[in-house]
């Protein structure tokens, strides 16, 4: 061959074109696509053009390979001898095709701008501008994977250096068959490149050649790699599958166990520990279809197949699965060989194309999925990608995850290539979690010992790695986006996938997502996918929408911040007392309740290692004092007997956590980010709450060395300068340093009452134990946490109510469209807010347009009347005939005192229910009641009630806004189960009696009137007189059969009502204890005195059959039945009243044990609800 083949002529790289199914190069004038592929330099994607430099006898190629002839190749201008590299004329004269080293001839890989290559010294963008500052321009980059050549006189494209045997039949006849054939697609003939530090993120340098990077081969490859290469029938080499020899490039002094794995032992850089498979016996298609070759990094499949990508989202072509198996190159592995990860076999869609899909269709799909792109930088190319991303995952046998993998992945997350594809990455605060990047959560959580390389250890290391890129990892690797089914766990997606994800809205992740949270402690069932991580809680069966998630987070976020602040105080005190790092332990069967004070346990507590004895933080401090006395030699010891009759000394208690501190810190950080993202109003002043959660050495908590000023929060109108104006108008110039700090920080003012309440805090500076959540001027004391929350809520609502009363003037608080004493809407519910003081009447049980209106009234602590429930109630299940056969407890209720059980049976009660003449004779001042919980025998009634409940988001047991659905599994919910109440009617002349005395419920209450007896004719006249004498605000439906009268007071008036009852009621009868049965009924005369003397008025609601009354927790209320009625009551836990419910639970000394145990888990329910809300909002647009 005397003339140079056309495919070896010196044609400029940017002028070369490619066929339709080949590689499409970057055309001049076209805009390049930024971003490097974070993976192998695949054949199916565009790559920078390279020029070849022929090999020499002393090149890095081993002597066992044949080398090409001396064909004159033009040398680029200014190439010269640099750093010991020879020119093109040092080639030998040998026949056959040539093996080449890839040499950089295009500045885009280093410098980034999209322009044709300039034949001259290149000036990188990072250099000072002098040519000498770029000593590596035109440096040969040893990338043995690519070869510029041409087959069948077609346009050039990229093929492997070692071609399969079936390509030899397609060569031109004038070409000799004299190059080595690769019997396996994994053959790699080069030495292992060493990854220099210049490829790390943030380095300003480039890849400088090191003589140790590419070491010449000492022996022929066939001899050194006896387990890899040998003679092949169709060529010079073949694969020997019986043994694996040591790596060719093993450095001197290194052993096989001590050195790193071969970074690039295969064509695309896969580990050499995976079984190797030969090429397919027949060609998969046309030669030019090699442009669609792809190997999935997640599957460890080393066969190169043709076809469309696995998912439409991934722009790189993917391998189809032949009928025979997952990958065409996967042959049955020998016994004892470690198998591939087979992640591609577990993908939902699989990896196969349809059986009837032709090769042309697959090629078209592959070409559509592979848009042309252009690499702009060589930084972190195949040298880094092969060594970092294509390692075997932690679940592979005998392979553990490298500790530096997480750090490298974190570096890649902030690279400009990734940021350009998916938008600017959020700025990582300086030392958001100091120490977490070095040691994770090992100082905060003891991990069980597992075997090296086990899946549990790898998963645990992945969980403890902390937040990446400012985001909390809410899903495990198996729940990651399904764009790349071969994606390895913990490996960053390729930029093409990331860019496609940003440009195209992919909804497949939402259909398969399960909100996997690393903070979970119990299976959170969402979209029917059980997801558990730490065990210990339950959740609704379906994921919540964005609106409900925002409502949850706005109502519970502040409370969680207060809980986290108490957590930090508890950990700090424990570490000062010499307690070691807290152990993470959660037993679902053990209640989270203190054994001494019976308060709920949020997270950190002390427990006995032998029994279920647990102490909260406050009781643990007492135990800590006893521990100090033991150290000093005192004989006094505080011990508590447990089930095993063993004493609990302070030294025997172990500091324990249900959730690790690192997980709580991550949740707090992401919650504040979601707040800012969706402009959710909050009163949390912790700013970046996770900065002080840094775990130090040995579990010691480290305080930040520098106090970073808090990020400014926007006010209600988005103007951050509004608070500054208020600050300047304050004439007080003698502020304390704490005041000054509070004044400099922006003050959120979502409503006028909160602004006034926050300003009024300065009036309480002289009181050390008064602290407001709106504008704290001193750090909160640990002993007053239980009264702070209720004071905040009461003061804010009182200020708002007083402003409304002042605006309305003297008289009743009734707006337009409301009659005196009766809040009667003139039209159905409107979308806008009603006038101040008006009650809400929902005429539909499940309103489509009044849900936000209900939330606004419910947030203000107002009762709500709902009509239309009779449409779904089955009256045959709730009539006297159906309920007469059931049992129940008959009680006697008086005006002064709680209900008392009687000796009457239920049969006698039901006999006089409809016939007053058949009623048993009772005292003039008493009325009969019947109480029965709906249990297993009432399955049909319970189902009908569940389908008829209004506002199921709140009232249903599995409602998304019912915190009871987030309580831990295994916890008894008897206090929240429906209860059946039946009562005789009260005559009109006995208005001092009621069917339910004045009481305060710890949780929210819904009462549905399912049945009422027909009213007697004389009652209509008495009803008219009764309605005309109603006091306060009322709500009723004209023309309806009014059966019960409700009087509901505001929750903030409970203390004044309690003091009033102590004045007017006999000793012991005027108690208003939360959760206890009422002991007094306020008739019209007492209600008038209460209104005139104490300024406390009430709402009056008239309830008819088929209507429901919703009463918020903490609101005192009483009921009077005008006729014999049957009602069903059920409790629920709404986010708006969760803080008040927890306070009332602590105040209720006579709560039954099951009630106390339930309400003690409120903090746990808040934690679970915030987790679900944060996970939903973080993924929302």
From Swiss-Prot:
Motif (LXXLL motif 1): 560-564
Pfam families: JmjC
Reaction(s) this enzyme catalyzes, per UniProt: N(6),N(6)-dimethyl-L-lysyl(9)-[histone H3] + 2 2-oxoglutarate + 2 O2 = L-lysyl(9)-[histone H3] + 2 formaldehyde + 2 succinate + 2 CO2
Major localization class: nucleus
Listed InterPro entries: JHDM2-like, JmjC_dom
Composition-biased stretches (Low complexity): 347-357
Biased composition (Polar residues): 447-461
Enzyme kind, highest EC tier: oxidoreductase
Cofactor: Fe(2+)
Positions annotated as zinc finger (C6-type): 594-619
Keywords noted in UniProt: DNA-binding, Iron, Metal-binding, Nucleus, Oxidoreductase, Transcription, Transcription regulation, Zinc, Zinc-finger
Compositionally skewed regions (Pro residues) per UniProt: 311-323
EC number: 1.14.11.65
Region (Disordered): 311-378, 413-472, 509-543, 696-745
Start and end residues of each JmjC domain: 938-1149
Extent of Basic and acidic residues compositional bias: 462-472, 721-730
Disulphides: none
Alphabetical list of PROSITE patterns matching this protein: JMJC
Positions that bind Fe cation: 999, 1001, 1117
Cofactor binding description: Binds 1 Fe(2+) ion per subunit.
Domain commentary: Contains two Leu-Xaa-Xaa-Leu-Leu (LXXLL) motifs. The LXXLL motifs are essential for the association with nuclear receptors. The JmjC domain and the C6-type zinc-finger are required for the demethylation activity.
Role of this protein: Histone demethylase that specifically demethylates both mono- and dimethylated 'Lys-9' of histone H3. May act as a transcription regulator controlling hair biology (via targeting of collagens), neural activity, and cell cycle.
Name of the molecule in the record: Lysine-specific demethylase hairless
Organism per entry: Rattus norvegicus (Rat)
Gene that specifies this protein: Hr
